[in-house]
């Protein structure tokens, strides 16, 4: 340890004869656990955690500690302003063919619950803040979900459309979305986006889940 070299030995709970080459069950478990950790460290190395937005409502758990991510996890934190989603929606920077497929799948399989505000006489400050027509909510959310995925992982389709930088992505391993309150006070929230990113399936079938934090909750 004086040379700062990590030594790691695996010992069984029971003493073995010196010529016994079998691997006890408890040692086998430790070896497999160590190997899984090694694979995880190698897989995460130099990937990124993408903060879409910043600290949510001053919540300490939503503060991305760059030193912890870089030094302990080997992940580089990156930040993307939430307005990037608005820019890509406005300019149509997403796969339009996949949008049609995703929207049709969502409308068929994702059933809405009841509207808790139905019939209420809401103040103008609230009704005025609803800038996306309720009938267009799912269109917006579908585009937002595709765009978030593209920000994290890139998309060759965008390169074909001429958006070369946007096509690259951030080589992400995980991400989070601020939302509250600068976004959700006037735009559809990211609940569906967060759920489908963390899901093991979407409109394309089975997929690997992506950890995606509500409120950019990196420290919890």
Where do the PLM segments sit?
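An N-terminal assembly and electron-transfer interface module characteristic of large anaerobic redox
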Residues: 1-220
